């Protein structure tokens, strides 16, 4: 007896994005719970640099939903979206009198999930 359950959720993950998770979360808060089309509009017109990788990731999640599970893009909403901190690249900036200041270049892992609304 095999019962097939239709998958109604698709996600995409972007790892090691060279951006602070704090700045990415500011963008993700705006699209969480919105429809796919509304989220696209918001991301295209927001003035933040974090919008570009989030927009690409949202489109990737929608393509995953369409190709892997046969879901329709018009009926999708952003189920969850979050940014976790990744490894921090540490660099030194030479300063006066032989000193060196530490520069931290943060990275993050972004996850976006789309869910079909019936």
UniProtKB/Swiss-Prot annotation:
* InterPro entries from the UniProt entry: Ribosomal_uL22 (IPR001063), Ribosomal_uL22_bac/chlpt-type (IPR005727), Ribosomal_uL22_bac/org-type (IPR047867), Ribosomal_uL22_CS (IPR018260), Ribosomal_uL22_sf (IPR036394)
Alphabetically, the GO molecular function entries are: rRNA binding; structural constituent of ribosome
Alphabetized, the UniProt keywords read: Chloroplast, Plastid, Ribonucleoprotein, Ribosomal protein, RNA-binding, rRNA-binding
Its primary localisation, in coarse terms, equals plastid
An annotated GO cellular component of this protein is:
chloroplast
Where in the cell does this protein reside? Plastid, Chloroplast
UniProt xrefs under Gene3D superfamilies: Ribosomal protein L22/L17 (3.90.470.10)
The record's SUPFAM superfamilies line, in alphabetical order, gives: Ribosomal protein L22 (SSF54843)
Which GO annotations describe the biological process of this protein?
Answer: translation
- Specify whether Amino-acid biosynthesis is a keyword of the entry: no
Task: State one Pfam family annotation.
Answer: Ribosomal_L22
Q: How does it assemble?
A: Part of the 50S ribosomal subunit.
Which HAMAP family does the record match to this protein? Ribosomal_uL22_B
Which family is annotated? Belongs to the universal ribosomal protein uL22 family.
Q: What's this chain's function?
A: This protein binds specifically to 23S rRNA.
Name under which the protein is recorded: Large ribosomal subunit protein uL22c
Species name: Rhodomonas salina
Task: Identify the gene encoding this protein.
Answer: rpl22
